[in-house]
Amino acid sequence: MTSSSRGYQRVDSSGDGGSLLMEEEGDNPHEALLHRNNDDYASTYHHVGVEYDSYEELERHEMDDRVTEIPEGFHRRQRRNLIYGDDVATDEELRVLRREALFGEEVTRAGLGRAEYYEDSHLIHSCDKSGHEDIDDESDDESKDEDEEEEETGIRKFAKLVLPHVALVLLTCTYTVIGALIFYSVEQPHEQMMKEQQLKLIYTRQNEFVDDLIRLAAGNETKRYEWESLAERHMHNMSDQLFVAFEKYFLTSNEVKKNAATETWTFSSSIFFAVTVVTTIGYGNPVPVTNIGRIWCILFSLLGIPLTLVTIADLGKFLSEHLVWLYGNYLKLKYLILSRHRKERREHVCEHCHSHGMGHDMNIEEKRIPAFLVLAILIVYTAFGGVLMSKLEPWSFFTSFYWSFITMTTVGFGDLMPRRDGYMYIILLYIILGLAITTMCIDLVGVQYIRKIHYFGRKIQDARSALAVVGGKVVLVSELYANLMQKRARNMSREAFIVENLYVSKHIIPFIPTDIRCIRYIDQTADAATISTSSSAIDMQSCRFCHSRYSLNRAFK
């Protein structure tokens, strides 16, 4: 060690244990750059002006590029590991550096430099720790915000799914109530006035009849035909007046007896009338009799009927989807209960389809609710209406069942009408739900039959354009059938008919041998076709997926 040039060689961590390297030229030491390794901390001094190694720079730049490509979550975990890891310098290392400073100026500089480095690094890590704690708090806040956003998005999705249906129902109800209010405000005053006029006319006719009877009695009239003619004339006038009052102004016998008019156009009856209009039931009692009321009825129906039909169809679709869901769960439960007998009832699958992952348990058909089940639901609901109306109205069960069926099918003859206003809203709820159930039945059963009708129609259309080979010529089946019918019309004799049948059976109907099921197909192996007649029999099966036929050897028991 000399005064002109002194140096401490740094040994690598894999060598003698990591010494300090200090290089000086003269009395002016150069600035040092401290680098932190994964295993230990060391200080390395470089001469000013000396360039870094190109390989180290390249590696550093590559690492920088790779770090930028790492996701943010990985950076967060890495920073947490650095914060709570064992990389921070301990107090024992600081004491060792202070002891090394007692052995010389150079060692003191090196030791103090290293101690300052560790103190600075400890301060930096403490700052980083506090900073990362803030980052963790921010990340927790961000996660909470994300959870809240997910909840909000879930609520929004649910709202988007439910709100249109709820809004449609509320719109229909609001529209019906507004229409009922207008009907009530227009028809109720006019109805009260007209009923009072009709009662006055009825009692006027009655008083006239009594006056004529008194006049005949005062004149000592004893001829019978005079009394009969007088009574007949007044009775006809009275019956005409009563019929008009009942038919046109819905006057009842109790009102005539008490000589007091009661309100037919109450608010409940107005809502009931509005519902019967928009649902196209139309009982016909009561009806608007004023011009303003009739004009409003037309305008109200133009928008109310489509709106109500759409709403009822939406409710029916909702019920049909839930009924299909319940029926599917019923089938699953039935499948689980009867799973031990599944092998006996399962359909056959050929080896080719089985090799492609198609098995016996694969469900390739949509769940279709049987028609009798839907019809049973409709009948049960109608019977429930019969029981309900027999309790609410003075009707028998059969009369109530008849009214319920007429209402559910929107026929609405009007011969039976609920009269009790106290139960009007219960009856309205029953009617609306019944119309939704009727729509559900049409949606579940009617669509299936419509599909079948279209299927047969397409098949018939395809059959018309089918080709047949007759006498070496290709002709349409429709043309062949027309020619045969013309020939049959010309040859009505039995002999010609027999010859024609023989011709048809010979040239049109292909020959089908009786043992066709025993004939081996071209793609069937010889081993599968070899069957012992003494111990087994041939059972031709059809594949569930590709519909190809193949034979199974089934031994006699």
UniProtKB/Swiss-Prot annotation:
<dbReference type="GO" id="GO:0022841">
    <property type="term" value="F:potassium ion leak channel activity"/>
</dbReference>
<feature type="transmembrane region" description="Helical">
    <location>
        <begin position="295"/>
        <end position="315"/>
    </location>
</feature>
<keyword id="KW-0633">Potassium transport</keyword>
<keyword id="KW-0325">Glycoprotein</keyword>
<dbReference type="GO" id="GO:0015271">
    <property type="term" value="F:outward rectifier potassium channel activity"/>
</dbReference>
<dbReference type="InterPro" id="IPR003092">
    <property type="entry name" value="2pore_dom_K_chnl_TASK"/>
</dbReference>
<keyword id="KW-0812">Transmembrane</keyword>
<feature type="transmembrane region" description="Helical">
    <location>
        <begin position="166"/>
        <end position="186"/>
    </location>
</feature>
<keyword id="KW-0472">Membrane</keyword>
<dbReference type="GO" id="GO:0071805">
    <property type="term" value="P:potassium ion transmembrane transport"/>
</dbReference>
<keyword id="KW-0630">Potassium</keyword>
<feature type="transmembrane region" description="Helical">
    <location>
        <begin position="426"/>
        <end position="446"/>
    </location>
</feature>
<feature type="region of interest" description="Disordered">
    <location>
        <begin position="1"/>
        <end position="34"/>
    </location>
</feature>
<keyword id="KW-0407">Ion channel</keyword>
<feature type="intramembrane region" description="Pore-forming; Name=Pore-forming 2">
    <location>
        <begin position="397"/>
        <end position="417"/>
    </location>
</feature>
<feature type="transmembrane region" description="Helical">
    <location>
        <begin position="369"/>
        <end position="389"/>
    </location>
</feature>
<keyword id="KW-0406">Ion transport</keyword>
<comment type="similarity">
    <text>Belongs to the two pore domain potassium channel (TC 1.A.1.8) family.</text>
</comment>
<feature type="topological domain" description="Cytoplasmic">
    <location>
        <begin position="1"/>
        <end position="165"/>
    </location>
</feature>
<dbReference type="InterPro" id="IPR003280">
    <property type="entry name" value="2pore_dom_K_chnl"/>
</dbReference>
<feature type="compositionally biased region" description="Acidic residues">
    <location>
        <begin position="134"/>
        <end position="151"/>
    </location>
</feature>
<feature type="glycosylation site" description="N-linked (GlcNAc...) asparagine">
    <location>
        <position position="220"/>
    </location>
</feature>
<feature type="topological domain" description="Cytoplasmic">
    <location>
        <begin position="316"/>
        <end position="368"/>
    </location>
</feature>
<protein>
    <recommendedName>
        <fullName>TWiK family of potassium channels protein 7</fullName>
    </recommendedName>
</protein>
<keyword id="KW-1133">Transmembrane helix</keyword>
<feature type="glycosylation site" description="N-linked (GlcNAc...) asparagine">
    <location>
        <position position="237"/>
    </location>
</feature>
<keyword id="KW-0813">Transport</keyword>
<dbReference type="GO" id="GO:0005886">
    <property type="term" value="C:plasma membrane"/>
</dbReference>
<feature type="region of interest" description="Disordered">
    <location>
        <begin position="128"/>
        <end position="151"/>
    </location>
</feature>
<dbReference type="Pfam" id="PF07885">
    <property type="entry name" value="Ion_trans_2"/>
</dbReference>
<dbReference type="InterPro" id="IPR013099">
    <property type="entry name" value="K_chnl_dom"/>
</dbReference>
<feature type="topological domain" description="Cytoplasmic">
    <location>
        <begin position="447"/>
        <end position="557"/>
    </location>
</feature>
<feature type="intramembrane region" description="Pore-forming; Name=Pore-forming 1">
    <location>
        <begin position="270"/>
        <end position="290"/>
    </location>
</feature>
<keyword id="KW-0631">Potassium channel</keyword>
